[in-house]
From Swiss-Prot:
It catalyses: a purine D-ribonucleoside + phosphate = a purine nucleobase + alpha-D-ribose 1-phosphate; adenosine + phosphate = alpha-D-ribose 1-phosphate + adenine; cytidine + phosphate = cytosine + alpha-D-ribose 1-phosphate; guanosine + phosphate = alpha-D-ribose 1-phosphate + guanine. It is an enzyme of class 2 (transferase). SUPFAM superfamilies: RmlC-like cupins. Its EC number is 2.4.2.1, 2.4.2.2. The lineage of its organism: Bacteria, Pseudomonadati, Pseudomonadota, Betaproteobacteria, Nitrosomonadales. Belongs to the nucleoside phosphorylase PpnP family. Catalyzes the phosphorolysis of diverse nucleosides, yielding D-ribose 1-phosphate and the respective free bases. Can use uridine, adenosine, guanosine, cytidine, thymidine, inosine and xanthosine as substrates. Also catalyzes the reverse reactions. It comes from Methylobacillus flagellatus (strain ATCC 51484 / DSM 6875 / VKM B-1610 / KT). GO terms for molecular function: guanosine phosphorylase activity; purine-nucleoside phosphorylase activity; thymidine phosphorylase activity; uridine phosphorylase activity. InterPro entries: Ppnp (IPR009664), RmlC-like_jellyroll (IPR014710), RmlC_Cupin_sf (IPR011051). This is Pyrimidine/purine nucleoside phosphorylase. PANTHER family: PYRIMIDINE/PURINE NUCLEOSIDE PHOSPHORYLASE, PYRIMIDINE_PURINE NUCLEOSIDE PHOSPHORYLASE. The gene is ppnP. Keywords: Glycosyltransferase, Transferase.
Length: 103
């Protein structure tokens, strides 16, 4: 999907890790939400409240889910899921353009 139609977007940006991750919240008519943003190169750890589906639009990264020892590489057009009440480490090698869907 190249665009979201009939949605609301929160104007205030979500800025994390001293600006290394910047996103905006998108609210869908059915009550679900997502964030659309970028993560700049570096290594970060994110905590999750609800399950997440991360869609990579462009860029490159490696991800390691909580409790796992192996890293998995992701690039444009790929997705990964993260359980709720968990965390994941991410190493971004090329600025990541992403959509994070909250389930």
């Amino acid at each position: 999907m190249a665009q979201f139609d009939n949605v609301s977007v929160k104007k205030k940006a979500n800025v994390y890790f001293d600006g290394k991750c910047v996103s905006h919240t998108v609210l869908f008519p059915n009550g679900t939400r997502a964030t659309v943003g970028v993560i700049f190169p570096g290594a970060l750890t994110f905590n999750t409240g609800s399950p997440e589906l991360m869609e990579i639009n462009s860029g490159a990264c490696k991800v390691r889910l909580s409790g796992e020892s192996d890293w998995k590489a992701y690039g444009a057009g790929e997705k990964f899921t993260v359980p709720g009440n968990s965390s994941f480490d991410i190493e971004v090698t090329e600025t990541l353009d992403y959509v994070c869907h909250f389930e």
